[in-house]
Design a protein with these regions (language model features):
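Membrane-embedded alpha-helical bundles that constitute the cytochrome b-like, heme-associated redox core
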Residues: 2-196
Length: 196
């Protein structure tokens, strides 16, 4: 019974993580959705993030326990930075909301928009690094199957190279360091290209 419970918990965690990433990628293409749908998707994302945090609360409890290796230190820095970026994203979302949280009438839309632009960019980068770290155990399992190991390595290198290309081509660094106040959407391009 206990094993079944652990498997169920692990499955739910994986579903939440996949759903979070897919929703966030969709939200990055803000010009494809109406404001209302964008905000509701964002609200769903933050609900999933809260669930994700609850499921992984033991990790926070273990922060000040045990020895810190370089790998653990790197993981902790990325996770804490991701938490901070997500919190900034949540707060800024409420400040700029024109639909879901408009009834709060908090004001601060100008600073909220700036914070939202920068924090979402950092969330995207940190979330990708976070996922990369959690894929490491799966990569270790591939060592038993050499044919899959090399295939996996080639795919990983190609994805990393494409990621660097897109990062530079779309000037993503401008959003990370607030070098631009606007995110442009090329309507001549297929919408599908913005998800790659």
């Amino acid at each position: 019974m206990e094993v079944m419970k652990m498997r169920c918990r692990r499955t739910v965690k994986i579903i939440i993580d996949i759903a979070m990433y897919l929703i966030f990628v969709a939200l990055m293409q803000e010009y494809l959705w109406s404001d209302g749908l964008h905000e509701w998707l964002g609200t769903t994302l933050f609900a999933l993030f809260i669930a994700h945090t609850i499921f992984n609360f033991r990790w926070y409890q273990s922060l000040f326990k045990g020895k810190y290796t370089p790998a653990r230190t790197t993981s902790a820095i990325i996770n804490i930075a991701l938490l901070a970026a997500m919190l900034c994203c949540m707060v800024s979302s409420v400040l700029v909301s024109g639909k879901v949280f408009a009834f709060l009438n908090l004001g601060g839309a100008r600073i909220g928009r700036t914070l939202h632009l920068v924090s979402t960019a950092w969330v995207f980068v940190l979330m990708s690094l976070h996922l990369g770290l959690h894929l490491a155990p799966f990569a270790n399992k591939l060592k038993k199957h050499r044919q899959f190991l090399w295939t996996g390595r080639i795919i990983a290198v190609l994805l990393a190279a494409y990621g660097v290309y897109v990062f530079v081509d779309r000037a993503f660094y401008e959003e990370l360091f607030y070098l631009t106040e606007f995110k442009f959407f090329d309507t001549d391009k297929s919408a599908a290209l913005y998800f790659l």
